[in-house]
Amino acid sequence: MSIVTKALNLVPMVVEQTSRGERAYDIYSRLLKERLIFLVGPIDDHMANVIVAQLLFLEADNPEKDISIYINSPGGVVTAGMAIYDTMQYIKPDVSTICVGQAASMGALLLASGAAGKRYALPNSRVMIHQPLGGFQGQATDIDIHAREILTLRSRLNEILAKHTGQSLETIARDTERDNFKSAVDAQAYGLVDHVLERRPEESIQPS
């Protein structure tokens, strides 16, 4: 049995009573009904497609109601992360982001790109920013092409972080030169999140 299959078998099921009897959901599908999306694990093309589809579905369902993305990710493929980022900016609903565990690399960029005033981190979560990583083998000309592409991506990622954090491009470039880890409080001070949540506000808990 593959690791993926084992992981899928561990997803809890939720059973609800309806007028037509019982209906079972996996926990993530049930939470999607509450407009909660989970971005968990490495960011790749498959994950990006799933997250983008969920965002577009929830926009179609109600374009006026906020969407929340819970992030616990070490980062991943830049282009996959940018697909999620562009969709978050494109759709009409505000997208709130919440860091649980860690938001590193592209995960940190997506955390910072939530709607202004609606970016959160839990108190013991960690955030890490750095420059994009890349490796390529081949002819010298091809290596040069890919090196220039990485520099282009780095410049664009720095622009996005500067836009959402309020830091200058020079500060972002300096601070992403190497892996730069931040606590939830430090991430708030830097502008990566707006609030550190100790407890959920009582008024935000709605009965199902």
From Swiss-Prot:
Catalytic reaction annotation: Hydrolysis of proteins to small peptides in the presence of ATP and magnesium. alpha-casein is the usual test substrate. In the absence of ATP, only oligopeptides shorter than five residues are hydrolyzed (such as succinyl-Leu-Tyr-|-NHMec, and Leu-Tyr-Leu-|-Tyr-Trp, in which cleavage of the -Tyr-|-Leu- and -Tyr-|-Trp bonds also occurs)
Protein's cellular compartments: Cytoplasm
Tagged with keyword Protease: yes
Pfam family for this entry, one: CLP_protease
An example Gene Ontology CC term for this record: endopeptidase Clp complex
UniProt keyword terms in alphabetical order: Cytoplasm, Hydrolase, Protease, Serine protease
InterPro entries: ClpP, ClpP/crotonase-like_dom_sf, ClpP/TepA, ClpP_His_AS, ClpP_Ser_AS
UniProt EC number: 3.4.21.92
Subunit annotation: Fourteen ClpP subunits assemble into 2 heptameric rings which stack back to back to give a disk-like structure with a central cavity, resembling the structure of eukaryotic proteasomes.
Protein name: ATP-dependent Clp protease proteolytic subunit
Lineage of origin: Bacteria, Pseudomonadati, Pseudomonadota, Gammaproteobacteria, Lysobacterales
